Amino acid sequence: MLEIDNQTPLESDFLLLEKIANVLAPTQIIELILVSGETMREINRDLRGCDYATDVLSFPLEAIPHTPLGSVVINVPLAQENALKLGHSLENEIALLFIHGVLHLLGYDHEKDKGEQRQKEGELIKAFNLPLSLIERTQD
C-alpha cells in the first residue's frame, strides 16, 4: 500500500507508483513524500549532514508489525529537470526514483552490493516499461 504526502503542486493519480509498491512490498505500507528542492536540501542536511538537494532519499523504519516499511522522499523539481534533460516524462522519472528508493528500503545497497540492486532495478524497469534506471545513468 502506498501513502502519499504531496507537498508540491504536482497533480497525478500515482497509479503507476501504486502498482510498483504492490509488486515490491505487497503487504507493507510505503510512505512517499514529494517535496521541493529546498525541503529536500533541509532533509538531507538535517538527517545526513549533506548540505545540498538530492533527487531521492530513503528512510527505512524498524521491522515492527503494522508500521510502514519506510519513507521515500522525492525532490519533484529536480525530477522534472532530469526528465526534461533525459527526454522522458516526469511520471517516469518519479517512478524510477521511487523504485530506487523502495529497493533501499528493502535492504538493497548499490554502493556495497555486487550488482543486485542494479539487476533488480533492471527487472522492474522492463516490467513497467520505463527508461534507463538511476543506477544505469550514474555508472561510468
UniProtKB/Swiss-Prot annotation:
Zn(2+) binds at H100, H104, H110. Its main location: cytoplasm. The keyword Cytoplasm applies. GO terms for cellular component: cytoplasm. It is found in: Cytoplasm. GO terms for biological process: rRNA processing. One of its GO terms (molecular function) is zinc ion binding. It comes from the Bacteria. Binds 1 zinc ion. Single strand-specific metallo-endoribonuclease involved in late-stage 70S ribosome quality control and in maturation of the 3' terminus of the 16S rRNA. Belongs to the endoribonuclease YbeY family. This is Endoribonuclease YbeY. It comes from Helicobacter pylori (strain P12).
